[in-house]
Amino acid sequence: MTSLTSDQINDYNNNGYLAPINVLTKNEASEVRSEIEKIEKLWPNELDGLGRNYVHMISPVFDKVCHSTKILDAVESIIGKKILVGGTTLFIKNKDKKGFVSVHQDDKYIG
């Protein structure tokens, strides 16, 4: 298990987030990017609505990311072994689009 250090856990508890965590190799990141580009080509209109949610249900690549031991071990260090993936979302902001995303909480807490 690659757990977080006590300093990382303290940082999370003090700040409410932890960054960076090295969870993808360059090859894995390339695979994820290729998968996003494939999804954009196959279902371009779906990414504007509900189709951008729960992408791990249609993509083996994103399902693999959801089950990554690097991610799960880090989460386990904070909340324990009972982990539930509540969803996955492709939130894509293309470089040619204006605007920004301000600091926000993605969703309410589950449970």
Language model segments and positions:
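Non-heme Fe(II)-dependent double-stranded beta-helix
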Residues: 1-111
